[in-house]
Amino acid sequence: MSKAKEGDYGSIKKVSGPVVVADNMGGSAMYELVRVGTGELIGEIIRLEGDTATIQVYEETSGLTVGDGVLRTKQPLSVDLGPGILGNIFDGIQRPLKAIADVSGDVFIPRGVNVPSLDQTKQWEFRPSAFKVGDRVTGGDIIGIVPENSLLDHKVMLLPQAKGTVTYIAAPGNYTINEKIIEVEFQGAKYEYSMKQSWPVRSPRPVVEKLLADTPLLTGQRVLDSLFPGVRGGTCAIPGAFGCGKTVISQALSKYSNSDGIVYVGCGERGNEMAEVLMDFPQLTMTMPDGREESIMKRTTLVANTSNMPVAAREASIYTGITLSEYFRDMGYNFAMMADSTSRWAEALREISGRLAEMPADSGYPAYLGARLASFYERSGRVACIGSPEREGSVTIVGAVSPPGGDFSDPVTSATLGIVQVFWGLDKKLAQRKHFPSVNWLISYSKYLNALEPFYEKFDSDFVTLRQVAREVLQKEDELNEIVQLVGKDALAESDKIILETARFLKEDYLQQNSFTKYDKYCPFYKSVGMMRNIVTFHRLATQAIERTAAGNVDGQKITFNIIKAKLGDLLYKVSSQKFEDPSDGEGVVTAHLNELNEELKEKFRALEDEYR
């Protein structure tokens, strides 16, 4: 504060929880960063009237008094972007928690702590690209590469608004993130740039254009990959009551999805859930194409903003997370962002809105809730990035929603469903039956099915038909359940009994998945397709056998469901045991086993029909 001039100060007029009103703030800008009080607490201007500014403070405001100074920084709330983001854990306004713990030695973050977001002293190996002195460069051009870790190369880009002629570019070597690595001249003025760049969190980073997303986001969860697929660059919502497994699905996506990297934002959730992520992730490994094992933490950034941290910072944490994701997208990577949970973010908006005495709308949420949610989800997408070389990247947003009491008519859930394209609805009843992932296949949907058809045709031309049959079986089973409860299973037609058996295979052995086993924690797409093919083949052959013998047999020798169960019991057991195929045996082995079972199904049913002909 020593360098600040007197004109840069305002004074506190009123304090109301995390909201502070200050006088003498003429010339301030909306969303400008300020330092409040003697403790220099971080705050952001959210409303201006005359020379009075309303500020939301991102730290505990107890102890502030009327008349305390408010220092303007003349810059918006920004995040630092550069090498050192991956594997790190930040709070909602990008303060590194590990560095703060080392500095303060405290369990909780002390107020007013001022620690740089990225390590200023660490030397990074810089390898310049093909640019040389005299070349013209524009914003987004990749000027060099820093091998951040063994998983990802960090591509150092020129700031989006920078351009000019190169007058200096650093030689290959080790540099800190603040050292000059390139100097450009534009209209007679020279500008220096380092590996680090700042970007305001509320402004989306510029792109050339948005592209159509056509590659699925494979999660390793059969129910999601086969029935309700997301895409890389899409938006997904996971609403569900407490204990339905939202966090487990979010963490499974972080661990096993086919993204290049993950930004996991724990926004207002319980502190022990973030602690669990911090304990689990460093121990988890992923197998690379060349067979080596790498820690998942190397491709993950955590933004922790737990429920006992100040409310206002929850709002910032979502923007911090999406800005970090966009930065990696601009390098040409496919990043996924998990927001767990957007309901807590909306509650923070509601609290701030209440403090500002704004007119409340549904359930006390502000009227602009839908617009805020939309502006956040709209920052996802597959894009053509600015700068050279030409490249494409994507940001996928998966938002968990926690409606109170599992009520999907809650304003946050309703507003979210109007925006997102994929809805994975979690069901309390399924969770109570210990059916996980507890995605309800009757209410969930994905609007990306048509966009993904070319991919499925290329992968396996039968898959679209298989999925259609599986969904029809599940739908019919739901209708038959009412009849079964009234008159019992035995009163059903034989073909309906087959539908119930197929649905049982689908529900218990396909859609249900055990995240804590070696063979089932992650299911590759080829295994999902092979398993579904065998279940649908059983359904088709069994129905066909019953119908054929029923139509053409006069002697009363008909194949019934009980006969199929008695004669082919071991085959049915094999169909339900497909999930025990271990993907670590390799694609060739698993596919061969599943194909053998398919042939065996056809052979045994043919023999059964011959016997009863």
Curated annotation (Swiss-Prot):
Q: What is its EC number?
A: 7.1.2.2
Q: In which domain of life is the source organism classified?
A: Eukaryota
Q: What Gene Ontology molecular-function terms does this entry list?
A: ATP binding; ATP hydrolysis activity; proton-transporting ATPase activity, rotational mechanism
Gene3D superfamilies assigned: 2.40.30.20, 2.40.50.100, Bovine Mitochondrial F1-atpase, Atp Synthase Beta Chain, Chain D, domain 3, P-loop containing nucleotide triphosphate hydrolases
Residues reported to bind ATP: 240-247
Q: Which UniProt keywords apply?
A: ATP-binding, Hydrogen ion transport, Ion transport, Nucleotide-binding, Translocase, Transport
GO CC terms of this entry: plant-type vacuole; proton-transporting V-type ATPase, V1 domain
Reactions it catalyzes: ATP + H2O + 4 H(+)(in) = ADP + phosphate + 5 H(+)(out)
Q: Does the keyword ATP-binding apply?
A: yes
| Pfam families attached to this UniProt entry | ATP-synt_ab (PF00006), ATP-synt_ab_N (PF02874), ATP-synt_ab_Xtn (PF16886), ATP-synt_VA_C (PF22919)
Q: Which InterPro entries match?
A: ATP-synt_VA_C, ATP-synth_a_Xtn, ATP_synth_asu-like_sf, ATPase_a/bsu_AS, ATPase_F1/V1/A1_a/bsu_N, ATPase_F1/V1/A1_a/bsu_N_sf, ATPase_F1/V1/A1_a/bsu_nucl-bd, ATPase_F1/V1_b/a_C
Gene Ontology biological process: ATP metabolic process
Per the record, the similarity remark reads: Belongs to the ATPase alpha/beta chains family.
Indicate the quaternary assembly. Answer: V-ATPase is a heteromultimeric enzyme composed of a peripheral catalytic V1 complex (main components: subunits A, B, C, D, E, and F) attached to an integral membrane V0 proton pore complex (main component: the proteolipid protein).
Q: Which HAMAP family does this entry report, sorted A to Z?
A: ATP_synth_A_arch
**What NCBIfam families does this protein's entry cite?**
PRK04192.1 (NF003220), V-ATPase_V1_A (TIGR01042)
Per the entry, what this protein does is: Catalytic subunit of the peripheral V1 complex of vacuolar ATPase. V-ATPase vacuolar ATPase is responsible for acidifying a variety of intracellular compartments in eukaryotic cells.
Entry protein name: V-type proton ATPase catalytic subunit A isoform 1
The species this protein was found in? Acetabularia acetabulum
